[in-house]
Amino acid sequence: MNNYFNKLTFIQKIKHLGQCRLMKKNEFSDGVRALLSKKIVIIGCGSQGLNQGLNMRDSGLNITYALRRDSIINQSQSYIRAMKYGFSVGTYDELIPEADFVINLIPDKYHESLIQKIEPLMKYKAVLGYSHGFHIVEIGVKIRQDITVIMVAPKCPGTEVRQEYQRGFGVPALIAVHEENNAYGTGMELAKSWACSIGSNKAGVLESSFVAEVKSDLMGEQTVLCGMLQVGSIFCFDKMVEDGLDSGYAGKLVQNGWEVITEALKQGGITLMMDRLSNVSKLRAFELSDQLKNILTPVFEKHMEDILDGSFSKNMMLDWINKDCKLLSYRQNNSQLLFEKAPVYCETILEQTYFDHGVLMVAIIKASVELAFDIMVKSGIKPESAYYESLHELPLIANTIARKRLYEMNMVISDTAEYGNYLFSDFVLPLLKKEFVPYLKRGDLDLSHVNNIVHIDNILLRDINEMIRTHPIEKVGVQLRSYMKDMVSLSF
């Protein structure tokens, strides 16, 4: 595929993929000063557009929304949202020519046509912002040289961007300046100011590149973040129902279980998550995790290869041309899942029960997080970026499932993430049912094994604990989580 990334030399590709630096807190001492006097126009009022705009306004910035003329006339959902929260709204022709800083927060599929419309309207030396670099990297359209192009990519859905800000904190973000569009050398200061305005400076910011953000983001969302949560939800629910468990209980265990289990992941990595299990369950989860890795490694590697060479993007863009035929078909099929239709279970499930009854769910998380991290790092992506795109974002995506199951997750994430998620889960789910089910035991999704007398091999337990603690993702996780010590814990 002839895109920006594929036009780079091999050395340039390695450089861009490996661009990653954890920024120091004192680098953000100027706060939002660089943007205080700017007229900022956000295009798009979806999940990221609305919630970033709310944070930026609360940080003292001047925010308006530019929408298509027909969206205003017909009072689209974006128009209704912007008006509900008291923002000024105008057309592209009305707002873009006066804007100092234009932030493009519409879905990836519309970026190319949008830039064709707004670039002639943008004033000399204006700034163009993205929160995902797909248009720059995968399509590769050149932006006018006098325009500075920057990115702030929060590592979570838009709803969580707002919630963490309202808690007085923020979410980690990757920031970058497109090296072909930084003629005046102001891009980084503006990107830092933008990051401060949404609260990311409080949670950890990586200085990255458009390439590293796009390739790691696509890999994370397709595999561990959305793909495996979807596969795991369907697989675990179906298995419990097949084993005779009440469908309401099974639905609640899965729906809320990801959030409860990954809260431990957020606070203390895989080590803490595994420590919430009994010794018997920990040994079993470790064993199941290894089996999953053996089955899934070729699949994860294939997704990474397709992302790097552009095959994934090419096929998705063909679906755009075909009016999202595949995406809409996947979406319809997903709405008919038994898990999505499971009855509400009204009785309380205690926090520890989610761990005790969800050994398989813990194993799925461990396997997919470590596998995605390892493959990204092998591909040239730095451990810090790989951590944010695997372990860190997982609890934030799990929170969406806890609200309204897979429907909520797929509604909140981008169309790009949703398409990749379906592509992954459509292949992996039958694979696991064929190759992984034979390894399962009754106790992997209930407590039946706990009452059995099991001899614990102390040496084996010691060695497994050591392997868990010394995995590279645990080492980088300790450093990155230190920036998030003010993060509020969820209670269940």
From Swiss-Prot:
Role noted for this protein: Involved in the biosynthesis of branched-chain amino acids (BCAA). Catalyzes an alkyl-migration followed by a ketol-acid reduction of (S)-2-acetolactate (S2AL) to yield (R)-2,3-dihydroxy-isovalerate. In the isomerase reaction, S2AL is rearranged via a Mg-dependent methyl migration to produce 3-hydroxy-3-methyl-2-ketobutyrate (HMKB). In the reductase reaction, this 2-ketoacid undergoes a metal-dependent reduction by NADPH to yield (R)-2,3-dihydroxy-isovalerate.
Top enzyme category: oxidoreductase
Its EC number(s): 1.1.1.86
Domain KARI C-terminal knotted: 209-344, 345-487
Lineage: Bacteria, Pseudomonadati, Pseudomonadota, Gammaproteobacteria, Enterobacterales
Entry's Gene Ontology BP terms: isoleucine biosynthetic process; L-valine biosynthetic process
Ligand binding (substrate): 414
Binding site for Mg(2+) 1: 217, 221
Name used for this protein in its record: Ketol-acid reductoisomerase (NADP(+))
Family: Belongs to the ketol-acid reductoisomerase family.
Chain ranges of the KARI N-terminal Rossmann domain: 17-208
GO cellular component, one term: cytosol
Listed cofactors: Mg(2+)
Gene3D superfamilies: N-(1-d-carboxylethyl)-l-norvaline Dehydrogenase, domain 2, NAD(P)-binding Rossmann-like Domain
Highest taxon above the source species: Bacteria
Active-site residues from the entry: 132
GO molecular function: ketol-acid reductoisomerase activity; magnesium ion binding
Signal peptide as annotated in the record: none
